[in-house]
């Protein structure tokens, strides 16, 4: 009816809603003036012009529920309180981030046991890792778009369900092929988990706080980095499928908590805008390009020579595809009107440098974490569990240094000096590790890991705040998704390049001995997976193989030294931007409140959906 408006009151945090008829007088009464601002005063001119006659309009009250103790909302200036609601969401996000990070690196320690328990296959063992990383990288921009289209809750929950399905496939796999497929499904969900955790935390925290909370996230990754080889070693010695079964109870608990408590309202989009946000063409080109590059670097030097067409053709196609992707994203066109990587993300010098440093940090962190257990198993005759314990000096310093860096950013709002310190420690630590050999002493391998771990820990929480400080709030989702993509893309190159250098060098230097080694199971395809079995080789061939492995591992570490130096010098190109103490996000956390039927002022904290007939010409 023209003289009656139908008002739906949605109680945040609950799936049910109810409707009541409200007269125009009630909506405009003085008692409710603060709770329900007169429509359409809360809409911009552009919003008014895009409204349809039936469109539901979300009206946000001027006096909103506080979300944190010490921050002000960037629009209303209201004090925000982090109550139990917030901490439940935060805890659930940290749990699923932990299991996703765990599965990213835990497989490296258990790889020899998995290889020994599955039927022989022509699939290279490092594809178990690559199959996880490829969809993980490609899915992060997609979930960034989904978070705007279907909302934060269903994006993160969808990613979690996909990850758990992949875990079941991996745990029940009886062949290498099925295991690789399961890892691919896991990676698809894992990419969404990583991207959405950072987007949601950016919604709920201020730029100043973000250093602290991302320090906690870094702590989670550091704990996962230490726990992964330990758990991988334990499970590989008893039952390797539990590497994947362990994800189910943790994931199920988190899923229930997020369904109940996570209710973040994002700006309304039309159906067309939602599709545009997904950027299907751009994401398809990116996925194909990353796939081609990963095939080339994974198979190069192992299954085929680097000069073979089977390697350089996909490599060239992948690099050309990346160039095409950038053209699609950066040149205005109808194919990608709302690109996942808009050009303005990289027009700001500070943001661009931070993205480069995020990539380099991902390369070094994941490459080193993957290679260190191989050194201890192959050279020092350690079991998977023992190699994890001997890797503790690398992970242990990451805990306090990540948290310390986050706290310092939160207190001072400064980050450049910390970044300089992080790169210096990383360069010193990895430089020392290039001198590891068969006879390296405990002091040398332990202390060099401590130095590197401190630098890696410092860098975890401090590259995202300058990115978000340099860009407008409207770019938060795309900027954060690009950050997650950049770091994981670095992980792909770090793990793949390190294992490729190691495998190529070891295979090349072992070929003269293959007449003795092939009957024992060592070949170009099994160089990485065979590391645990070196201690079972007869003398003197065991000493020869250990020397070759030690040199190959040292060669892989040399890759990271110039990267750390580059990271240090790029810091001079950053500006020390202020980190304001307000929430820089267009999304809002909805909290459960009591709503009275009379719509008194106590209902000011509710989210009201007003469905009304909108005149064709709005004032």
From Swiss-Prot:
Major location (coarse): membrane
Function: MFS-type efflux pump; part of the gene cluster that mediates the biosynthesis of mannosylerythritol lipids (MELs), surface-active substances that enhance the availability of water-insoluble substrates. Mannosylerythritol lipid production is responsible for hemolytic activity of Ustilago maydis. MMF1 is directly involved in the secretion of MELs.
GO cellular component, one term: plasma membrane
Disruption phenotype: Impairs the secretion of mannosylerythritol lipids (MELs).
Name of this chain's protein: MFS-type efflux pump MMF1
Transmembrane feature ranges: 87-107, 131-151, 161-181, 184-204, 211-231, 242-262, 278-298, 311-331, 359-379, 389-409, 418-438, 450-470, 482-502, 552-572
Record note on biotechnological use: MELs not only have high potential as eco-friendly biosurfactants due to their excellent surface activity, but also have attracted considerable recent interest because of thei runique properties, including self-assembly, anti-tumor and cell differentiation induction activities, and moisturizing and hair-repairing properties.
Gene for this chain: MMF1
Region (Disordered) residue spans: 1-74
Compositional bias ranges of the Basic and acidic residues kind: 45-61
Compartments where located: Cell membrane; Vacuole membrane
Residues with glycosylation annotation: 32, 74, 348
Database matches in SUPFAM superfamilies: MFS general substrate transporter
Organism the protein comes from: Mycosarcoma maydis
